[in-house]
């Protein structure tokens, strides 16, 4: 009896423990189910989760320019060298000792300016001798003419023969010939004396002297005394491809002088402006180019002989052309294209047909219109339809630095 009583209590205790365990099990399961919707909702509201947590980074910064309509000049370009209009080596035409130089190296001189002097003593002596001989022979001629006049009277009275009259006539003629020779000798001596004073044959700039005062010089010296280069005006000889010849000839036929500009080696500074002078009469078969000569007044001495320059010749002007910065024009598998911005700052690729272009701007013949906005910088980050941030040129770097800083901040937070 006592044993069965204990067995019943054991069964009761086991049942109670099982009931408590079941209660806690079902209570925990219900808590998990009720917590799941809240956790999901919280995740959706969290900045780090859902769509808001996966939003894209900052907009790509770009620079843009507006296509404009303007008149665009068409230039032909070539490489060339400045050449003097005339180059003269000043030499002495007589032999003698150089006693004076009357120029400063590098100065501008005019035709007729005295440059140098050779000792004139010997030439003065020769002139005096020639003049003396001329005077002597003139006196002889005067006496012969008087004798001839007397002979002409005496022959009428037969006091002199006809033969004597003819002889006297021949003497007069001979003396007249001698006078002419004497006059030529005087002129030659005077010329030699004049040549002892050496003058500039042309206007121009004198170079460095080739001989010093005191030296004996002669007319056969090849180096001369000094070289004069005529730089007012001055010429530019440059080359153009043979394919441009027809364009130049057509522009010449229009009747207006073609303007030629001379630019420095780096093509960054305009040195002077002149006009086309002539085309060569044949093409260089080796290079396929033709030589062209232009002339410049060069009153400011901006150009020097043998100076290397870049030539630009204006041959035409294209009116009402659509122009954009050259930086906006890109090349792809499909050809040339530009990125065009719409009113919402979204970009789209437009295929275009380029025309005249230089380092700064390019004419677009088809593909866009005046007023369209095109991307000029930040092009490598673009995709079709992407929205961008248009920034000023001076702030583009700042925008990129800000974007980079944000990216680094994100990486730091994740790490």
UniProtKB/Swiss-Prot annotation:
Highest rank taxon of the organism: Bacteria
Keywords of this entry: Cell inner membrane, Cell membrane, Membrane, Signal, Transport
Molecular function GO terms recorded: efflux transmembrane transporter activity
Induction, as annotated: The mdtABC operon is transcriptionally activated by BaeR.
Signal peptide: 1-21
Keyword rRNA-binding tagged: no
Database matches in InterPro entries: CusB_D23, Multidrug-R_MdtA, RND_pump_MFP
Cell location: Cell inner membrane
UniProt-listed Gene3D superfamilies: 2.40.30.170, 2.40.420.20, 2.40.50.100, Helix hairpin bin
Any GO CC annotation of this UniProt entry: plasma membrane
Membrane topology recorded in Swiss-Prot or TrEMBL: Peripheral membrane protein
Pfam assignment, any one: HlyD_D23
Disordered: region residues: 32-59, 392-415
Broad class of where this protein is predominantly found: membrane
UniProt feature, compositional bias: Basic and acidic residues: 399-415
UniProt subunit comment: Part of a tripartite efflux system composed of MdtA, MdtB and MdtC.
Matching NCBIfam families: PRK11556.1, RND_mfp
Function per UniProt: The MdtABC tripartite complex confers resistance against novobiocin and deoxycholate.
Family statement: Belongs to the membrane fusion protein (MFP) (TC 8.A.1) family.
UniProt name for this protein: Multidrug resistance protein MdtA
Organism the protein comes from: Escherichia coli O17:K52:H18 (strain UMN026 / ExPEC)
């Amino acid at each position: 009896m006592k044993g069965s009583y204990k067995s019943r209590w054991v069964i009761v205790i086991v049942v109670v423990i099982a009931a408590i365990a079941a209660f806690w099990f079902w209570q925990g399961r219900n808590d998990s189910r009720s917590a799941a919707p809240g956790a999901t909702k919280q995740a959706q509201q969290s900045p780090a989760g859902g769509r808001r947590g996966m939003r894209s980074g900052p907009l790509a910064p770009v620079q843009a320019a507006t296509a404009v309509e303007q008149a665009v000049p068409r230039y032909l370009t070539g490489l060339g060298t400045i050449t003097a209009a005339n180059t003269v080596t000043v030499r002495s035409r007589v032999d003698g000792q150089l006693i004076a130089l009357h120029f400063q190296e590098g100065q501008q001189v005019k035709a007729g300016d005295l440059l140098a002097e050779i000792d004139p003593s010997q030439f003065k002596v020769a002139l005096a001798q020639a003049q003396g001989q001329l005077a002597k022979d003139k006196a002889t001629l005067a006496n012969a003419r008087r004798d001839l006049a007397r002979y002409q009277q005496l022959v009428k009275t037969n006091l002199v023969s006809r033969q004597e009259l003819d002889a006297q006539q021949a003497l007069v003629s001979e003396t007249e010939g001698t006078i002419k020779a004497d006059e030529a000798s005087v002129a030659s001596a005077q010329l030699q004396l004049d040549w002892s004073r050496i003058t500039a044959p042309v206007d121009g700039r004198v170079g460095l002297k080739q001989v010093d005062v005191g030296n004996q010089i002669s007319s056969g010296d090849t180096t001369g005394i000094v070289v004069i280069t005529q730089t007012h005006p001055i010429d530019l000889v440059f080359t153009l491809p043979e394919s441009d010849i027809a364009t130049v000839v057509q522009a010449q036929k229009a009747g207006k002088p073609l303007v030629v500009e001379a630019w420095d080696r780096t093509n960054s500074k305009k040195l002077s402006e002149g006009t086309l002078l002539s085309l060569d009469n044949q093409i260089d078969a080796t290079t396929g180019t033709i030589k062209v000569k232009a002339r410049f007044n060069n009153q400011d001495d901006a150009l020097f002989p043998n100076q290397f320059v870049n030539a630009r010749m204006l041959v035409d002007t294209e009116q009402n052309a659509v122009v954009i910065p050259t930086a906006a024009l890109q090349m792809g598998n499909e050809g040339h294209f530009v990125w065009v911005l719409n009113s919402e700052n979204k970009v789209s690729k437009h295929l275009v047909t380029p025309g005249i272009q230089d380092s700064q701007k390019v004419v677009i013949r088809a593909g866009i219109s005046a007023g369209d906005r095109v991307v000029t910088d930040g092009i490598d980050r673009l995709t079709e339809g992407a929205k961008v941030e248009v920034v000023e040129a001076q702030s583009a770097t700042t925008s990129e630095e800000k974007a980079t800083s944000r990216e680094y901040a994100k990486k730091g937070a994740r790490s």
